[in-house]
């Protein structure tokens, strides 16, 4: 059973086996506490978040930088969401609204564009050892930020990465500009460093609480025991606890799935095997 929660109480609902945090915005300490303590109890957490907020409208798309509030907590565990977007020559297609000059008039139309922000992941880009992608040999990721991991205390598995011909965009120019780049509408990445970027990772091991040794200064106690005394903060998780991070949240949005299905046909995976 799937249950939605905003974690505003500072706790994850009882009997939760897997906590998925999708496209978080301006997380408060109580919400971070709920995520943190669920992980410390040995629960599996999946974070799907980017450094960019992508807006879709009927006639344009845009992206602006954002801070979701999850960044300090992830950084505590040695995981950073890069403040860029990954572009790749191994790409998918997107029915995108564009404007075309027709004589003295401007015409709005929709084109099926080769879209470098939709990264077409093939079997060689997907982890085939953990069992998470069992039976999956292709996946498209949308508007994804790269991940940087630096925590030798954890066992880190790359779930999927971009191709060796990918590069990073620091500007967020996700709307095509055919005046500037007539051939494709986008910067080709010429002169940029080309390399594979981590797009999703799975970290496992013992995690230390972000709240360890810190006062819990929000307006409710972390929890109350049967004798009425506050429950202590759990400061370390059991061994083998798992945290997965995906550098995009919008790829799960209904509007994006509908648009991409329209462009590429139904090519969406069933649930991942976490």
Question: What role is predicted for each listed range?
Answer:
Residues 1-274:
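Acidic, S/T/G-rich, low-cysteine, solvent-exposed domains in lumenal/extracellular/periplasmic regions
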């Amino acid at each position: 059973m799937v249950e939605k929660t905003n974690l505003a109480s500072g706790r994850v609902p009882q009997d939760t086996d897997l906590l998925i945090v999708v496209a978080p915005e301006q997380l408060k300490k109580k919400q971070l506490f709920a995520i943190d303590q669920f992980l410390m109890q040995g629960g599996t957490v999946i974070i799907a978040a980017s450094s960019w907020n992508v807006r879709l409208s009927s006639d344009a798309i845009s992206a602006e930088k954002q801070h979701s509030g999850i960044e300090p907590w992830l950084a505590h565990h040695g995981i950073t969401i890069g403040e860029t977007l990954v572009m790749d020559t191994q790409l998918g297609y997107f029915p995108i609204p564009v404007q075309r000059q027709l004589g003295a008039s401007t015409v709005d139309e929709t084109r099926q564009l080769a879209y470098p922000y939709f990264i077409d992941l093939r079997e060689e880009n997907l982890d085939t050892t953990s069992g998470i992608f069992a039976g999956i040999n292709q996946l498209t990721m949308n508007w994804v930020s790269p991940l940087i991991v630096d925590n030798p205390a954890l066992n880190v598995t790359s779930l999927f990465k971009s191709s060796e011909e990918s590069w990073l965009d620091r500007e967020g120019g996700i709307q095509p500009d055919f005046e500037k780049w007539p051939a494709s509408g986008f910067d080709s990445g010429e002169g940029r460093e080309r390399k594979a970027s981590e797009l999703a990772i799975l970290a496992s091991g013992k995690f230390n609480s972000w709240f360890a040794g810190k006062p819990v200064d929000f307006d409710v106690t972390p929890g109350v025991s049967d004798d009425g005394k506050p429950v202590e903060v759990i400061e370390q998780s059991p061994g083998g606890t798992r945290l997965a991070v995906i550098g995009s949240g919008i790829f799960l949005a209904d509007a994006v799935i509908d648009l991409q299905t329209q462009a590429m046909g139904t090519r969406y995976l069933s649930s991942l095997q976490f």
